Amino acid sequence: MRGYHGDRGSHPRPARFADQQHMDVGPAARAPYLLGSREAFSTEPRFCAPRAGLGHLSPEGPLSLSEGPSSVGPEGGPGGVGAGGSSSTFPRMYPGQGPFDTCEDCVGHPQGKGATRLLPTFLDQFEKQLPVQQDGFHTLPYQRGPAGPGPGPGSGAAPEARSESPSRIRHLVHSVQKLFAKSHSLEAPGKRDYNGPKAEGRSSSGGDSYSGPGSGGPPTSHHHHHHHHHHHHQSRHGKRSKSKDRKGDGRHQTKATGWWSSDDNLDSDSGFLGGRPPGEPGGPFCLDAPDGSYRDLSFKGRSGGSEGRCLACTGMSMSLDGQSVKRSAWHTMMVSQGRDGYPGAGPGKGLLGPETKAKARTYHYLQVPQDDWGGYPTGGKDGEIPCRRMRSGSYIKAMGDEESGDSDGSPKTSPKALARRFASRRSSSVDTARINCCVPPRIHPRSSIPGYSRSLTTGQLSEEFNQQLEAVCGSVFGELESQAVDALDLPGCFRMRSHSYLRAIQAGCSQDDDCLPLLAAPASVSGRPGSSFNFRKAPPPIPPGSQAPPRISITAQSSTDSAHESFTAAEGPARRCSSADGLDGPTMGARTLELAPVPPRASPKPPTLIIKTIPGREELRSLARQRKWRPSIGVQVETISDSDTENRSRREFHSIGVQVEEDKRRARFKRSNSVTAGVQADLELEGLAGLATVATEDKALQFGRPFQRQASEPQPGPRAPTYSVFRTVHTQGQWAYREGYPLPYEPPATDGSPGPPPVPAPGPGSGRRDSWMERGSRSLPDSGRTSPCPRDGEWFIKMLRAEVEKLEHWCQQMEREAEDYELPEEILEKIRSAVGSTQLLLSQKVQQFFRLCQQSLDPTAFPVPTFQDLAGFWDLLQLSIEDVTLKFLELQQLKANSWKLLEPKEEKKVPPPIPKKPSRGRGVPVKERSLDSVDRQRQEARKRLLAAKRAASFRHSSATESADSIEIYIPEAQTRL
């Protein structure tokens, strides 16, 4: 595309002839056709028509590939190259870089007679002379394969001239690498100087001026102008000019026969910047399309102001709100696929063949935001390119391996170091401002982010993540409490999709500098008790240093590890849920929870965490009790880790993903193995009242009546904080039942709140629930948590026991009533009916369900009931329990009415219409029959009503569930962070 003499490629000259390059100015010399950088190019993309017989341009033959762009320019000056002209091969970081980073390739046409012609080999020599800084990354150029010859006779030869220069290729590769190192690492400006001088030196060779052979402008002026532009726009076009250079020789020719270097597809792929006035930084440099195929290929002028710019170039400048690639600018383009790099089919893609484009797109750019941009030890890393955007598959692979291998390596502080730093930071006051979590992730250098949000292959991510996780866990847990380590049951490999992982990390980790999402201790959301914090996309707040070691809950949102709840039973009613162990020590006097005055670091809710803290319950917040379902939290630290794991009543962390609890407490991973069964837990801090009311809602949906497990609610002796945590578990498909853990239950460790059944009698029912709440909080015994899905069977057993206990209590109460009072036979019949139905239910369905639950907990059982099976059976069981509950409810009403039948009133009301129909003689029998029928009708109506309610609630839950599940999986569906 850049005018190449047909002869240009015909006999490349070795570097030793470099001096001749300067001297060969005669038309006979293979003067490179230099497009004048300031050539007035029309702003519209110019497809420079190949100049037809340009034989006179070069004695050796008409131009082959480089026909015309120069002539097209309004002012086709002789693109003579001034000594100062900058070559585009060097990445230019200087803002002054000219709009067109002309390629040395452009050196193809003899400028006017007076134009200084640089021999193409001069570039090679120059490259050899220039000290190439090793970047540490070597990309092997691979032959692109022959491309169609350009229209000009010499087209075939010209490309070869370029491709034949290995030093040229190496130089291009290094230039690209350096460019990325510069633009993305933003290493010290001093390092960039080589771009300036080298660029200048090259520019002299690199033909900065675009000019047609016929044009006769002063070469040097164009050249200098261009050079300045280079410096001004190097950040943006350094790459382009670089690849442009390559294009001229290696790439545009490559189309014909060149080599594609691994960096070939980089931003400057399309030499065309269309649609900009030449003076503009992005001014169009229209390389003559060497042949129709190129022209057809895709020089579609972009219609935007930034048209023709590769996102990689402009994205950096735009990424941080106009900040030129500073700090983590790249993470905005983090996982962008190659096609994302080039917005539209604009010049960015212009010269790439479709195959190359496809190839380019297949790889994600591996962009490693330099965390602190200082995080990389500068020593010895001069050439290293933190941004691995080289697209060749082997290159990426190598880079990925390298990075996964040294994920803990120098480029980023190792997770252990980060963990230690984090721990020390935690101990030292953590800037509380961050507690507000709302800091956009970008603002923090994310030096601690383990993955650098690299989009590696999933395998690499898994390996890297595992390594980092192990390192972090090792250091964190070592620094945290060893007990945490005990509870920590990290799965060997977190199966996570790279994008969800990146997303999680970005959301959780990138938020704070060293707030390793892993270690990001929840910022102690300052103890404004009543406030509800919406940690919706904020990074987990870093807790004030005073907080206890954070609980690390790593929720990798692996689709397979959908919901892991870690329950930790806590004994000790007076346990404060001190979200942080630190809280344990100081007792928050005012707090009913004995919360340490230290603002408990509310466990960093996953980005979607909404923490509602009950006024006194700072710790509740830390308990993350109200954690609204957290979609995929990357790595989350729950500061709730209570040292008194045993005392902390069970903390549960539902994270849709692997969640590691630091607590020794049976922090078990509850992992529902089916991807679709991702259980989402809404932990809601609710007062007992809420518990009682909620418990009776949607029986079918909220199976787990407030399973008031005294969940780490350290209810101080007074148990004043009788807030129970409701976890509404949405089982992705069907039920959303609520568990209220804090209910301390009675002796039966499984004393869940009566739960589903409506409180039958206000006295026994609600009173009972309250009493349960107040009864000492007893942690459930460790029911073997070894089952694959312990939570499912175990939870249902607990709920079942609560129901059984409730029903037995009612039966005993009614039996005592029957014994203590002389009740009418009708009432006694009702009592016997209720008690008999209850006993039958307990002896049959309840036993059956209990066996199913046990079976689900038994790994050896062959048909292991799934969570859905248990939930479905539980739902059916609830129907029977509801029937029995209705009977007891009726008995409670009778008792409230001094055991006087309420029915007679109804009989008086109901019979009158009936007698009207039948003869009075049969009135009495009809009345009796009507009474019976009324009773049956009433029962049937109740059943129908219950069924309708259940169905409606089920549909509602299903709808909400489906919505939730959609949200859950959105992260996995997205490929951008």
UniProtKB/Swiss-Prot annotation:
Keyword field contains rRNA processing: no
Function: May play a role in the molecular organization of synapses and neuronal cell signaling. Could be an adapter protein linking ion channel to the subsynaptic cytoskeleton. May induce enrichment of PSD-95/SAP90 at the plasma membrane.
Transmembrane spans: none
Gly residues: compositionally biased ranges: 74-85
Compositionally biased spans, kind Pro residues: 538-547, 754-763
Keywords for the protein's UniProt record, in alphabetical order: Cell membrane, Membrane, Phosphoprotein, Synapse
Assembly with partners or alone: Interacts with DLG1 and DLG4/PSD-95.
MF term (GO), any: molecular adaptor activity
Xref: PANTHER family: DISKS LARGE-ASSOCIATED PROTEIN 3, DISKS LARGE-ASSOCIATED PROTEIN DAP SAP90/PSD-95-ASSOCIATED PROTEIN
Gene: Dlgap3
Span list, region Disordered: 1-30, 52-90, 137-167, 181-289, 398-417, 529-582, 739-788, 906-939
Organism: Rattus norvegicus
Protein name: Disks large-associated protein 3
Biased composition (Low complexity): 53-73, 202-212, 258-271
Family designation: Belongs to the SAPAP family.
InterPro entries from the UniProt entry: SAPAP
Composition bias, Basic and acidic residues: 1-10, 189-201, 767-777, 925-939
